[in-house]
Amino acid sequence: MRKLGETEPELKSTVVAVFIASEENSSISGIGVDAVAKDGLLNELKHGPLFWIDTADKQPCIGTGGMIPWKLHVTGKLFHSGLPHKAINPLELAMEALKEIQLRFYKDFPPHPKEQVYGFATPSTMKPTQWSYPGGGINQIPAECRISGDVRLTPFYNITDVIKTLQEYVDDINTNIEKLDTRGPVSKYVLPDEHLRGGITISFDEAHSGVACDLDSRGFHVLCKATKEVVGHVKPYSITGSLPLIRQLQDEGYDVQTVGYGLMATYHAKNEYCLLSDMCQGYQVFASIICQLED
């Protein structure tokens, strides 16, 4: 942008740079690129490609995953671990319920044929990432626990459909909790004499949809050509990592293409870094793109 400002070339197209504030913000609404888009300040960019510079490895990233954060809260009955037949062990219930949910998820949302076209490294996944319980003695079966995790969803499935389906899984498991696998001869999730049943509830935090870039657009073609010229090869890829906001921009009519010049191997590392040589190539790629858009 500095070079363009200094030389002031006569261009057929307008080059606009947006420096994003709080790109991964989730706690403060109304700032950053979402607010800029809402106020219509990006509307002119609908007439040309929009390049989102936030991926890595100098290659076009043509697909990203949606994300559904979930929490599974499990209730049982607290009791001494020496008398497990008088308890409902929420840890065992959580493990078996989650296993059942995962089995159903992978049956209902299998690898999609378009994932091969886009080169996704993984299909959609549903897995735990955190486990917590209130605490207590080692000889105490707790009354409750919670498992948290996420769904990473390729953009060929609908976020709303998945949330609805996960809730249906949980409702069905609760209704038929006696049919769930147990852990050993005295493990159980119902205490008929006490009229007690274990139970699970699922809740969701804010979900985001994934993106499949338009592979027929001019923006994609000029990016690929520029990458091949500068880097020496072009190999688009897709991951189920999530990029915020770009699906919203795509739905509003923008030709969103994503690329980046950091290193995927250092994503979220303690000492995350990039290479100046890669950034220089990024400069050359976009100089080539600007030239191509003049044709």
Task: For every predicted segment, state its role.
Residues 1-65, 294:
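Acidic/histidine-rich catalytic neighborhood of metal-dependent amide-processing enzymes
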Residues 60-62, 69-295:
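Metal-dependent amide/peptide-bond hydrolase catalytic core
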